[in-house]
Amino acid sequence: MEFNFEPSNEKDILKKYSRNLNEEVSANKLNKIIGREQEIRRVIEILSRKEKNNPVLIGEPGVGKTAIVEGFVQKIISKEVPENLVHCVVYEVNLSSLIAGTFLQGEFEKRLNALIKEAKQNNGAVILFIDEIHQLMGMGKAGNNSGMDAANILKPIMARGEIKIIGATTSNEYRQYIEKDGALERRFQKILVEEPTPEEALTIMRGLKEKWEIYHKVRIQDNALVASVKLSERYISDKYLPDKAIDLIDEAAAKIKTEAHTSPSEPINKKIFYLETEKIALSKEEGTNQKERINEIEIELEKLKQERDLVEKEWKEQKEQQVALNKIKKEIEKNNWDVERYQNQGEYTEASKILYSVLPELKKKLEAIEKSISENKKVLIKDYISEIDVAEIISRITKIPLNKIFEKEQDKLLNLFNNLKKRVKGQDEALKLVSDTVLKNRVGINNPNRPIGSFLFVGPTGVGKTEVAKSLAENLFNTEKAIVRINMSEYMEKHSISRLIGAPPGYIGYEQAGELSEQIRRKPYSVVLLDEIEKAHPDILNVLLQVLDEGTLKDNQGRNINFKNTIIIMTSNVGALYLMENKEDMFERELKTSFKPEFLNRIDEIIKFNSITMEFAKEIAQKMLDDLEKRLKDNNYQITFDKSVVEYVAKNGYSKEYGARPINRFIQKTIENFITESILKNELIKDRSTIINFANNKLAILKSN
């Protein structure tokens, strides 16, 4: 068997294993970079050094590390860099193609050395950009005994300053791979790339708007850009700006573009198909009625076909308008780019021709097409993205109803106390304390580095402690499911702390996430309900001190979990007996015995829940019966409960000791059983208004129309 290896042409090695970013910027293939001036300036400063002139961009995924390099290349093209960098060409090295097919020992090293040799021959005019630079560690190793990986080949060359490299990687991967190799780390100069602020992200989005409009053939309203930043910041916690906001706009634009290619005549075509199918079926039968129906179908088909032809004609015309509009926009973008290019090259005559002759003519054409589009009587093609479209994408991701996303925060907060009162009866004082604390946080009076609110709910069982938590989740975070409930009776042993934040390194289960930390990482806008907190081991409460004070918690993987957008509610029955007997001093004493002072001192409010009185028992019974009425209505049973039933339920279900739960059990045992029997006996009929009352010591049905 013969092997024939053809040596690769060294002159083409850069083209083969990398892409020329200067060429792509010159051809207007890359997005124009807005902002990040400080980071780009830092890259220029490091590259201008004599030694250690290799910057490495470190930041979370999606914050714009690659965009900074592209921004630097744009500065080179527009000659906004020092003289030593004006003639530089930046190549992005493709590491995967560099190592692909190197099955023989030494082949990878040969390719890499050829790449370095060509870069060196250009007297420092070639700058190599390596994305995911941590992959150099171990790349190309032939075996465990070989140390010739890519990093070891590059280290001496980088130390002498013979080649300039720009790297990019994430914080975790830099720590995990590059920091371990001190020799490689000291050859790089770190540039930390932070996530941009919402204002900076919005500026970046506005700079990208024109490119998206031309690509997707849609107009993007400014309120859509604002909504993408605002909503992604609030509802998407596992990604970073501007990447997550860009994703929303891109997906919304793709959705509109897909809808634009769907003919509006499709529903009409379906109707025509159904009628033609019916006509064929009827034509096989004989009879006067069938013939009359066939005549009716033919008349209807004629109308529908005319309507379809008209709609399709209008749709095609509007589509042609959109194509013409997009063509003009592309020409304007190309000419704008040419103006910039000619100005950079000093060809001001050519730039002036485009600026004062070609562009005004194109803009007139654009205005004429936009005017004709606005005059369309019936808009069949939606050609713009609004904040509603962005919210629909968020709604799809988070499963939060669209109307809840757009509900005004101010209205939500002003009605918070009243909304809580509707659901929880007899605890007005407790609800007022909770709502006031939440309002202070939302207005910005509270410390922003703490959770929205932290509460210890104390009181007898069945008085509405858990119900308040559910109601808060629904009113503040738009869904009752935004509640992270942990039963603290499961954390009675000291070692169970590992279940809460994850097992430490070296222990079984280290790779698994903690119950509390992982849920908050996934759902940062939540109500955290720690039920029966007094039953947890005291050391577990020590973990919560950091959460209550700083609003953060470090999990077993070393990640900081943000609790600043959560409400922390802890429930306890400590001293409940003394509260029922109005013995405040005894209650305070038992509370201090059960919990450490540093724990109690970090809680915003200790909220005492009252025992339920007979008056409030009637209100609770009324609410539970109203809920039962709604459930029955969903099954088409129009049932109303008389006041006598409310009195009967409250009187027999009320228990000062056990709260509202016995009322619910009594309704299940008596009222629901009575309704079930009545339905089976056909005494209750669907869609008939019925009143149920309590008289002569028994439940009775009063029928009405």
UniProtKB/Swiss-Prot annotation:
Q: Which organism is it from?
A: Malacoplasma penetrans (strain HF-2)
Name the PANTHER family for this protein.
Answer: ATP-DEPENDENT CLP PROTEASE, HEAT SHOCK PROTEIN 104
Residue ranges for the region (C-terminal) are 612-705
Matching entries from Pfam families are given as: AAA, AAA_2, AAA_lid_9, ClpB_D2-small
> One GO biological process from the UniProt record?
cellular response to heat
Q: Which residues form a coiled coil?
A: 246-378
**Residues holding ATP 2:** 459-466
Q: Where is this region: NBD2?
A: 409-611
Question: Which terms are listed as keywords in the entry?
Answer: ATP-binding, Chaperone, Coiled coil, Cytoplasm, Nucleotide-binding, Repeat, Stress response
Q: Where in the cell is it found?
A: Cytoplasm
Assembly information from the UniProt record: Homohexamer. The oligomerization is ATP-dependent.
**Stretch list, region NBD1:** 12-195
Q: Which GO terms describe its cellular component?
A: cytoplasm
A Gene Ontology molecular-function term?
A: ATP hydrolysis activity
Q: Where is this region: Linker?
A: 196-399
Known function: Part of a stress-induced multi-chaperone system, it is involved in the recovery of the cell from heat-induced damage, in cooperation with DnaK, DnaJ and GrpE. Acts before DnaK, in the processing of protein aggregates. Protein binding stimulates the ATPase activity; ATP hydrolysis unfolds the denatured protein aggregates, which probably helps expose new hydrophobic binding sites on the surface of ClpB-bound aggregates, contributing to the solubilization and refolding of denatured protein aggregates by DnaK.
Entry text on domains? The N-terminal domain probably functions as a substrate-discriminating domain, recruiting aggregated proteins to the ClpB hexamer and/or stabilizing bound proteins. The NBD2 domain is responsible for oligomerization, whereas the NBD1 domain stabilizes the hexamer probably in an ATP-dependent manner. The movement of the coiled-coil domain is essential for ClpB ability to rescue proteins from an aggregated state, probably by pulling apart large aggregated proteins, which are bound between the coiled-coils motifs of adjacent ClpB subunits in the functional hexamer.
Q: What is this protein called?
A: Chaperone protein ClpB
